[in-house]
């Protein structure tokens, strides 16, 4: 008799994706982050569902309802902080996952990579709308500043902003629709992640060498299931330490003040995971230019495949490219730091230089050493 996991229509799909899936024998811990992102997504949906049971998307009661969750709901505080810090873990895993894809040339899987970029945009949109929901000072002013950027679009900009707001300013209508979108988007992300996985399994996983591993595959279970569980335990440990010991470490104190349209905070800034993009946006004095640079900073990932000039897929054996990759990482960390600083000297010029360097490394400097490395192969 055939095993049920190989014959049952539904079990067969799960079996081919997570159990009998042929996987390269040499994939390192950098390949753990896909499964960690799946765990983060499940955690966010579950905690978000319980938060939605008690939250009210009305400007007069939103802030109070979040306070009520933390004070009066059984274990409401841990659900709230798991959700808030879970988003930070989500983005840490996401950035490492994208970085690994850039380092090892995973962008050569065109469909998988492009859907990944769409996923990145969707997750960023979801996180932004989630940040607005507690209706604190930073929620309100963050929403006002970021939605206002759309007014830079020629001709239709102002109408578009008022359409998104549902009025002439960020108000009840904005909060209600942001809550609706914040609720539905994680399910769209789940669907996109399934398609992402579907395309990945069409080609099979990449590996650190960047060389085809078809002749040396091992079953996903038990080898990589155990490895993924270990990674998940590490991630949960870090998340729980953050939630139980320092839940507000990554938040903004301004968000503990109810939203007040008449009082602007001294420094308006988004959550830490958007600071690099925010720094790029601020570094250009022109509004439309800033918006275009902001979008380009993420959309540039789609060009990675076209900018690949090396004969080798992975950076594993390309020291010059490795140096540039780590320069890019350092530059993004610098941008994150700048995004959290006030708009004054010397931060303005540092931000502008770091923004130029960011695009310069990806568009110009990275393709160049690849050509040198190709010539070195002939020696």
Swiss-Prot record:
Heme b b562 binds at residues 83, 182. It comes from the Eukaryota. CDD domains: cytochrome_b_C (cd00290), Cytochrome_b_N (cd00284). GO terms for biological process: mitochondrial electron transport, ubiquinol to cytochrome c. Keywords: Electron transport, Heme, Iron, Membrane, Metal-binding, Mitochondrion, Mitochondrion inner membrane, Respiratory chain, Transmembrane, Transmembrane helix, Transport, Ubiquinone. InterPro entries: Cyt_b/b6_C, Cyt_b/b6_C_sf, Cyt_b/b6_N, Cytb/b6-like_sf, Cytochrome_b, Cytochrome_b_C_euk/bac, Cytochrome_b_N_euk/bac, Di-haem_cyt_TM. It is a multi-pass membrane protein. One of its GO terms (cellular component) is respiratory chain complex III. GO terms for molecular function: metal ion binding; ubiquinol-cytochrome-c reductase activity. Binds 2 heme b groups non-covalently. The chain crosses the membrane at residues 33-53, 77-98, 113-133, 178-198, 226-246, 288-308, 320-340, 347-367. Pfam families: Cytochrom_B_C, Cytochrome_B. A ubiquinone binds at residue 201. Heme b b566 binds at residues 97, 196. Its cofactor is heme b. It is found in: Mitochondrion inner membrane. Heme 1 (or BL or b562) is low-potential and absorbs at about 562 nm, and heme 2 (or BH or b566) is high-potential and absorbs at about 566 nm. Belongs to the cytochrome b family. Component of the ubiquinol-cytochrome c reductase complex (complex III or cytochrome b-c1 complex) that is part of the mitochondrial respiratory chain. The b-c1 complex mediates electron transfer from ubiquinol to cytochrome c. Contributes to the generation of a proton gradient across the mitochondrial membrane that is then used for ATP synthesis. The cytochrome bc1 complex contains 11 subunits: 3 respiratory subunits (MT-CYB, CYC1 and UQCRFS1), 2 core proteins (UQCRC1 and UQCRC2) and 6 low-molecular weight proteins (UQCRH/QCR6, UQCRB/QCR7, UQCRQ/QCR8, UQCR10/QCR9, UQCR11/QCR10 and a cleavage product of UQCRFS1). This cytochrome bc1 complex then forms a dimer. This is Cytochrome b. The gene is MT-CYB.
